[in-house]
């Protein structure tokens, strides 16, 4: 059934504190917008500056993010970039294990999300490696066992909107109304997750995934509408093509555009989590926006 939206109720919004139960039983409360730092233990992610493929590079990346004040680390061992090399489950697990060992040597308190669409990878990352959150770009569509695993390990789940898979997702950009259709599709999945007993869910509109340039900015403009789910909202636009195509530059030059969108997402859209390559810049955005909000 299509979602009925009263647009007047959601013209703008602000950050709402939220809590999540971690697999180890901890209840973690987040009182301000969170900065999620990207750790790609891959050789072929779209932004070269995010690639940390050997132990020394991973060590340096983790140390830098921690020094810059990262709140959550998002580790991925399989690039979702179109055209990326296929990676076996065994290789993805090997990469993640290497990265998780280094992360947990540096910190045991900061939550770690594992960026994977494979249920067995998610299970082992949570139950054996010490990850806390499952970040699934497919929303459960690429592995039918994913939600069963998330329920069994009692992990918070990032539900992202995407149609198809990273190779063919741009073949599925036909929407009657992009925001309403994305909301409706996410709403259907939320109902299924609720039936399975999965409660701690973060919503990701899926910027850049099965959306055209114009559709990405329509979603950004309509971000307040995503609060109808009363869930934390993750925004992942860091150095993506929705920035580089509009500004005619490259991902290496995408920090200014990323900062602009993150500011809009926080100030106008009430974003809960910013997923970024550049932790220090995002922390500054959060600090400025929070100071502005709380000023008399």
Predicted regions located by residue number:
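Active-site-adjacent loop and "lid" segments of alpha/beta metabolic enzymes
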Residues: 6-15, 20-24, 30, 45-64, ...
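Hydrophobic "anchor" residues on beta-strands that sit immediately upstream
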Residues: 36, 70, 111, 131-132, ...
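Catalytic domains of carbohydrate-active enzymes, especially glycoside hydrolases
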Residues: 60-76
């Amino acid at each position: 059934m299509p979602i009925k939206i009263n647009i007047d109720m959601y013209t703008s919004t602000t950050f709402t504190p939220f809590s999540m139960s971690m697999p180890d039983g901890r209840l973690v409360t987040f009182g301000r917008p969170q900065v999620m730092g990207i750790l790609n233990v891959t050789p072929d992610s779209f932004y070269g500056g995010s690639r940390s493929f050997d132990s020394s590079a991973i060590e340096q990346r983790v140390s830098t993010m921690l020094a810059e004040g990262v709140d959550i680390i998002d580790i991925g061992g399989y690039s979702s970039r179109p055209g990326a090399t296929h990676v076996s489950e065994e290789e993805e697990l090997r990469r993640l294990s290497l990265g998780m060992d280094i992360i947990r040597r540096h910190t045991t308190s900061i939550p770690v999300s594992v960026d994977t669409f494979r249920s067995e990878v998610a299970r082992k990352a949570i139950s054996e490696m010490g990850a806390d959150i499952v970040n699934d770009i497919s929303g459960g569509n690429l592995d039918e066992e994913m939600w069963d695993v998330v329920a069994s390990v009692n992990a918070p789940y990032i539900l992202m909107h995407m149609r198809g898979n990273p190779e063919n997702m741009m073949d599925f950009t036909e929407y009657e109304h992009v925001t309403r259709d994305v909301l409706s599709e996410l709403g259907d999945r939320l109902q299924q997750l609720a039936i399975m007993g999965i409660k701690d869910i973060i919503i990701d509109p899926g910027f850049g995934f099965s959306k055209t340039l114009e559709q990405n900015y329509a979603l950004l403009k309509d971000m307040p509408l995503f609060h109808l789910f009363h869930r934390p909202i993750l925004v992942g636009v860091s150095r993506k093509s929705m920035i580089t195509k509009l500004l005619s530059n490259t991902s290496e030059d995408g920090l200014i555009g990323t900062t602009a969108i993150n500011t809009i997402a926080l100030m106008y859209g009430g974003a809960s989590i910013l997923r970024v390559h550049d932790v220090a810049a995002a922390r500054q955005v959060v600090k400025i926006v929070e100071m502005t909000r709380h000023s008399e």
